[in-house]
Amino acid sequence: PEVDEYLRRQSMSAVDYKAFVERLKKELPGEPILIVRFGDHQPSFAKHMVDPALDDTVLARRIAEADPRFLATYYAIEGINFKPASLSSALDTLDAPYLPIVVMEAAGLPLDPSFAEQKRVMKRCNGLFYRCAAGAEAKRFNRLLIEAGLIKRL
């Protein structure tokens, strides 16, 4: 039943996405549009297919350790009346905190100093954020944002 429901929803999503793109083209003819889709995990039933012998405790540990068999980021970038300016930051592995960099560069927008620094972290860490250097890079970057006054009231 879980797999059937997943496939049903995937089918609905594909139909809805196609209708969404067609509506954008109709309502905004000639306008440049950048669409980004993002996800970061396998469907819940995947655990039974990937390694059915795992109990919930071991599975939870594997997910917490970011085992790529259970936790994998995916994203897609599509332009309508628009060719993405740069996809140089579109790495195979890309944690969610870096997605704004990819979107801004694809849209042809300049990176402000905080995003430029985050891009340097992204390159150093090969697309990982919290899992890079046992979290040290994320802590350092977030500390920079706090000290710059960009993150407040923690």
Regions found by a protein language model. Name each.
Residues 1-154:
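Solvent-exposed soluble domains appended to multi-pass membrane proteins
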